[in-house]
Each structure stands twice: as structure tokens, then as C-alpha cells.
Amino acid sequence: MMTLQEEKIQAPVFFKEYVKGRFILNIGEYNHPLILSATQVLEYQDKIDDIQSIKKSHLDLILATNPEIILIGTGEKQLLPPLEIINQIAKAGKSVDFMASDTACKTYNLLVNENRNVSCIII
């Protein structure tokens, strides 16, 4: 379990705690992978089990928020994504960082607290 330091985060949505597969945000608790913008949890249809199951529809959802930064938390360990994911994001002219999910939660919190337009998929 990783409890995230709450340094007076002023963002509408942020992580309070992360335990493998369980996310406690300031707005609720979730037991499935999340897609977030800087301001909300985004609803999606196709199930995400791992980095291999991220689909174009998930990336389209994130890209529609016009983020300056995209984070993808790949689970317990940092994993390399399928090339299709990198290509789709690159075609949109966005930067993306892949990291372990606990690190992605911390990074998301730091960026939203700086009022950065960040979106993420956290597995």
C-alpha cells in the first residue's frame, strides 16, 4: 500500500492512496484501471486488463481532453507499450511517459497541483 502525501492539493481530482489495482481518489474509490483528465475520471467502455489491452478508443478519450502531458501507469512495474500506442500519441503531437502505476499516481498529483493539463491511464 502506498499512501500519497497530500500537500494541500488544489486540483479537482487527485490520488490519495494506491494499492495494486485499487485507487483511492479525493472523489471516491475505484477497483479497476482508471482514465483521468486533470479535472475528472473519464468513463470508458472497453475493459483494460494490462498495457496490451489499451485500445485506440482509450487513447482517443485521453486525446480529446487535449492534454499537454499523458501518463500511462503500467502496473507494478514499468513496461514497454505496444508500438501502436506510441504511434497514435505521437501522431497527435503529444508526449507520453510510461511508468509503474505508483509512480504515475505521484507524478499525476504533482502535475495537477501545478495546474498542468495532464491525462492518464493507470492500470
From Swiss-Prot:
CDD domains: Mth938-like (cd00248)
Any one GO CC term of the record: plasma membrane
Assigned keywords, A-Z: Cell membrane, Membrane
Organism superkingdom: Bacteria
Primary site of residence: membrane
InterPro entries: MTH938-like_sf, NDUFAF3/AAMDC
Stored Pfam families: DUF498
Subcellular location: Cell membrane
PANTHER family according to UniProt: NADH DEHYDROGENASE [UBIQUINONE] 1 ALPHA SUBCOMPLEX ASSEMBLY FACTOR 3 (PTHR21192:SF2), NUCLEAR PROTEIN E3-3 (PTHR21192)
Name of the protein: 13 kDa major membrane protein
Lineage: Bacteria, Pseudomonadati, Pseudomonadota, Gammaproteobacteria, Thiotrichales
